[in-house]
């Protein structure tokens, strides 16, 4: 009888214990909090960029986490490295935009855009944590790129007979 639904999926539960998965999950949480805290502040264009960037990165992280859990083949480390460097650069821009906009004076010289508002400041803090997460992911990808694992460390098949030596004593 065929199996349908979630039981038919072969999830890679070992992926949960890898540092890359954990840092990607932290990146997922930080991007979720960054855009959701800033979503109600649409009167400033800089805040709109933070929301859009956070939404895009949250969606990509969600997709990548599911990809890892569903036994997707690993991406090339050089691709991961440069993607994380680019995303980290955009996270730095979000951090600068959110911080500078919150600190900008409006009206009276003493009144700041975010005076009395905690959500944009918290969003800037999560943008910093997101930047740190992308730095960690870039480091992990760079380390894999520069020191690739040996071919023997890859499990090519789950079949124990396939793992037998090529030469045999059977005649």
From Swiss-Prot:
Q: Where is the signal peptide?
A: none
Keywords of the record: Cell membrane, Membrane, Transmembrane, Transmembrane helix
The keyword Repeat belongs to this UniProt entry's keyword annotation: no
Q: How does it sit in the membrane?
A: Multi-pass membrane protein
Q: Which residues lie toward the Cytoplasmic compartment? A: 1-22, 70-77, 143-171
Annotated membrane-spanning segments are 23-42, 49-69, 78-98, 122-142
Principal place where this protein is found?
Answer: membrane
Q: Which domain of life is it from?
A: Eukaryota
Tell me the compartments it is located in. Cell membrane
Extracellular topology ranges: 43-48, 99-121
GO CC annotations on file = plasma membrane
UniProt family annotation: Belongs to the Casparian strip membrane proteins (CASP) family.
Assembly and partners are described as:
Homodimer and heterodimers.
Could you identify this protein by its name?
A: CASP-like protein 0U2
Q: Which organism is it from?
A: Chlorokybus atmophyticus
Q: What is the lineage of its organism?
A: Eukaryota, Viridiplantae, Streptophyta, Chlorokybophyceae, Chlorokybales
């Amino acid at each position: 009888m065929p199996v349908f639904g979630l039981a038919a999926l072969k999830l890679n539960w070992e992926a949960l214990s890898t540092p890359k998965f954990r840092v990607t999950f932290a990146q997922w949480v930080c991007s979720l909090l960054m855009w959701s805290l800033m979503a109600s502040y649409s009167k400033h264009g800089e805040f709109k960029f933070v929301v859009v960037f956070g939404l895009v990165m949250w969606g990509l992280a969600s997709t990548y986490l599911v990809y890892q859990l569903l036994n997707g083949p690993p991406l090339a480390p050089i691709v991961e490295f440069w993607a994380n460097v680019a995303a980290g650069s955009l996270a730095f821009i979000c951090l600068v935009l959110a911080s500078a906009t919150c600190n900008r004076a409006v009206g009276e010289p003493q009144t700041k855009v975010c005076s009395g508002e905690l959500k944009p400041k918290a969003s800037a803090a999560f943008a910093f944590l997101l930047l740190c997460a992308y730095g960690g992911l870039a480091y992990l990808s760079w380390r894999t790129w520069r020191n690739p694992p040996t071919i023997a460390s890859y499990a090519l098949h789950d079949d124990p007979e396939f793992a037998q030596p090529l030469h045999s004593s059977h005649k």
